[in-house]
UniProtKB/Swiss-Prot annotation:
Coiled-coil ranges from the UniProt annotation: none
Protein name, UniProt field: UPF0597 protein CLI_1810
Organism expressing this protein natively: Clostridium botulinum (strain Langeland / NCTC 10281 / Type F)
InterPro entries, per database record: Ser_deHydtase-like_asu, UPF0597
Superkingdom of this protein's organism: Bacteria
């Protein structure tokens, strides 16, 4: 595959995001809907796919102590700046939160069960009329904007039922046409200057980690760091990763670099690699190449599991990606990288997702531990053999199988998780 296609996909799949991307997506949708209509808000209706609803259900809103779909939608309409994309709530103020709390009776959330992929629709009614926005397939991919039933903007084909994917999704799906040896060849041979931009994710996610080490969230990252000696890059990796996620899910007003639409994915896919780089004094080029490998494997799996799913994509998909990157940084090559992925597939695939919340750092820690274990096993030629569980004869089928466990495998599980969450909130 042409290197430029791969680089273009990597660029498209990584972007800054403030807070967990599902509430950010809801806020962006309502911000855009309000932007086109203006006036005094009478009511807001949000229609979201089950996965997006679940992930935003108990997740903190950046810069506030508030959580959930309703507050995300209200704050998006009240103070959101749609031009900032997934950072649309960057300018939030205390008075905006106070105003939103008085308007909770004006918000209605509806779950759209019969839909494929990510979906969020905002209908904002004011004294000026109705503003409507639809986001599809990617968290910031606005495909329709209406003002009083007049279409102001519409992406071609994105609302056609015969076309299930936006152009961005089609481009990313090309990754699944690659064999693992082609992926590794790209990582080894692409000019460093062409992938140096990947290091932007390190700068951003490291700042978030430093914020988390103040003890935000459940304080897991800070706890792990307290028992980490100077040369232990594994515990250091866990501490960096968990502290960043602690900060993110608790509403810290510091952005993460997302990948495949998730800040937690972006954190897990990068910070363990930074830990190795720092402790082993490796150069930035090696780090960038390992991030490229981590991202590509993550994207590959997510193309089969879906952007949002019943399993914890952060630990499973991003965890498998970073396991390959870890193996690469520790001297592994194609055979060892392949065996690392087999080991990961046989370990934590199937870990459930209960939405973005304070427990995310626990799952992330499990994912990072499994990633290091899988890589170390592979480097010692210890591997789960083909035809054992979901490990297939080809590594490409094995990565596909990881995704298949989530979709269609765990669709009923996802429904039951959501039912439990809704029942528990009453």
């Amino acid at each position: 595959m042409d290197q430029n296609i791969i680089i273009n996909i990597l660029r498209k799949e990584m972007m800054p995001g403030l807070g967990v991307t599902e509430p950010a997506s809801i806020a962006l949708s309502s911000a855009k809907a309000y932007e086109v209509i203006g006036g005094e808000i009478k009511n807001i209706k949000i229609i979201a796919d089950p996965g997006l609803f679940k992930n935003a259900f108990s997740c903190a809103i950046p810069g506030t102590k508030e959580v959930g779909n309703e507050m995300a939608a209200l704050l998006g309409a009240i103070c959101g700046d749609a031009s900032l994309g997934l950072e649309c709530l960057r300018k939030i103020k205390k008075e905006d939160v106070s105003k939103a709390k008085t308007m909770l009776d004006k918000i209605h959330i509806e779950i759209k069960s019969q839909t494929e992929g990510l979906y969020v629709e905002s209908i904002v009614t004011t004294n000026n009329g109705i503003g409507r926005t639809i986001i599809r397939y990617k968290h910031d991919n606005i495909v329709l904007v209406e003002k009083n039933n007049k279409i102001l903007y519409q992406k071609e084909n994105t609302l056609n039922k015969s076309n299930n994917f936006s152009q961005e999704a089609i481009d990313s799906k090309k990754i699944t046409e690659m064999k693992l040896d082609e992926i590794v060849e790209f990582v080894n041979n692409v000019n460093y200057e062409k992938i140096e931009f990947l290091l932007e994710s390190i700068k951003m996610n490291k700042k978030l980690s430093e914020k988390g080490l103040e003890g935000l969230g459940i304080g897991l990252g800070k706890l792990i760091l307290e028992s980490c000696n100077e040369n232990n890059y594994e515990l250091y990796a866990e501490a960096l990763t968990c502290s960043a996620i602690d900060a993110r899910v608790s509403g810290a007003a510091v952005p993460a670099m997302t990948v495949t639409g998730s800040g937690n994915h972006g954190i897990i896919a990068t910070l363990p690699l930074l830990a190795i780089k720092e402790k082993k004094n490796l150069n930035n080029e090696m780090l960038a190449r390992s991030i490229a490998l981590s991202y590509i494997i993550n994207i590959y799996i997510k193309e089969f599991s879906g952007k949002l799913s019943a399993f914890c994509g952060c630990a499973v998909a991003a965890g498998t990606g970073v396991s390959a990157g870890i193996c690469y940084l520790l001297g592994g090559r194609l055979k060892e990288i392949e065996n690392t992925i087999k080991n990961m597939a046989s370990n934590i695939t199937g870990m459930i997702c209960t939405g973005g919340n304070l427990a995310c750092s626990l799952k992330a820690n499990t994912g990072v531990k499994a990633a290091f274990l899988s890589a170390k096993m592979a480097l010692k030629n210890i591997v789960i053999p083909n035809k054992c569980g979901i490990v297939s004869n080809s590594i490409e089928d094995t990565m596909k199988n990881i995704g298949r466990i989530a979709y269609p495998g765990m669709m009923q599980t996802d429904k039951e998780i959501l039912n439990i969450m809704i029942e528990s909130s009453k």
